[in-house]
C-alpha cells in the first residue's frame, strides 16, 4: 500500500511538473522555428508559467474546502492543456495556457505532497516521500529524452505537444484509481499558528 501511494504521487509529479510545467523548455526552439514565439516572447511566456505556479501553490496552501477537487483539476488540467497547446499558434495563447498550467501544477505539487506525506506517515513509511519528490526530476529527464526523439524525427511543435500530452494521459490513467477521492485528503479547518522567527530558526534559515 505504501509503495503504491508513493508511486502514485511520483507519477502525478512526473506529469504535472515534469511534463505539464517543464516540457515547455525543449519546445521553445520548435515554437520559434514555427514563428509562434520569439526569444523575447518565449521568456515572457515562461514567466507566465512561473506566475501561475505561484498562484496555484499559494491557493493550495490556504485551501480548506474542495481540496480534492483542486487536486483532480490540477492533474487533469495539466494533461488537457498540454494537449491543447498543440493548437496554440501565438505568444498570447501560449502565455494564457502556460499561466493556467502553472496554476494546475501548483495545485498538484502542494496537494499531492500533502496527501502522500499524510498517508505514508500513517503507514509508518515516511521515508518513501523521497520517491514522490523524485517525480519532477524524472519528468524533466523524460521530457528531455522525448525532445531528442522529436528533434531527430523533425516533428512540428504541435505534434510534439500531442506526444507529451498523450504520454501524460497514459501515465495518469495508470494511477488514477489510487489517487484520493472526496474526503480522503484532510486539511485542518483552522488556520495554523503564526510562525515565530526565533533565534534558532533564524540561524537555520541563514545556514
Describe each PLM feature range.
Residues 2-29, 33, 200-207:
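Pair of pore-lining "gating" transmembrane helices in MFS-fold secondary transporters
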Residues 18, 22, 102-110, 141:
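Small-residue-rich segments within alpha-helical transmembrane domains of MFS-like 12-TM solute carriers
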Residues 49-51, 137-138:
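Short hydrophobic/small-residue motifs within alpha-helical transmembrane segments
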Residues 54-89:
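Conserved MFS/SLC helix-loop-helix module at the cytosolic interface between two early adjacent transmembrane helices
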Residues 91, 130-180:
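Helix-loop-helix hairpin linking two adjacent transmembrane segments in secondary transporters
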Residues 92-98:
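Short hydrophobic/alpha-helical segments at membrane-entry points of transmembrane helices
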Residues 99-135:
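Cytoplasmic helix-loop-helix junction between adjacent transmembrane helices
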Residues 179-207:
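Juxtamembrane intracellular "pre-TM" segments in multi-pass secondary transporters
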Amino acid at each position: 500500500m505504501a509503495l503504491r501511494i508513493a508511486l502514485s504521487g511520483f507519477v502525478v509529479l512526473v506529469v504535472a511538473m515534469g511534463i505539464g510545467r517543464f516540457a515547455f523548455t525543449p519546445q521553445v526552439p520548435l515554437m520559434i522555428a514555427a514563428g509562434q514565439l520569439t526569444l523575447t516572447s518565449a521568456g515572457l511566456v515562461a514567466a507566465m508559467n512561473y506566475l501561475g505556479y505561484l498562484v496555484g501553490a499559494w491557493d493550495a496552501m490556504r485551501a480548506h474546502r474542495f481540496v480534492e477537487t483542486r487536486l483532480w483539476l490540477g492533474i487533469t488540467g495539466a494533461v488537457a492543456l498540454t494537449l491543447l497547446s498543440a493548437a496554440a499558434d501565438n505568444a498570447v495563447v501560449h502565455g494564457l495556457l502556460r499561466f493556467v498550467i502553472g496554476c494546475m501544477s501548483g495545485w498538484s505539487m502542494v496537494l499531492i505532497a500533502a496527501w502522500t506525506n499524510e498517508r505514508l506517515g500513517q503507514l509508518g513509511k515516511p521515508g518513501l516521500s523521497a520517491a514522490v519528490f523524485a517525480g519532477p526530476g524524472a519528468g524533466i529527464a523524460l521530457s528531455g529524452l522525448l525532445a531528442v526523439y522529436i528533434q531527430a524525427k523533425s516533428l512540428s511543435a504541435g505534434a510534439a505537444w500531442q506526444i507529451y500530452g498523450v504520454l501524460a494521459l497514459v501515465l495518469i490513467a495508470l494511477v488514477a484509481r489510487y489517487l484520493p477521492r472526496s474526503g480522503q485528503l484532510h486539511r485542518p479547518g483552522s488556520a495554523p499558528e503564526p510562525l515565530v522567527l526565533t533565534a534558532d530558526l533564524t540561524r537555520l534559515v541563514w545556514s
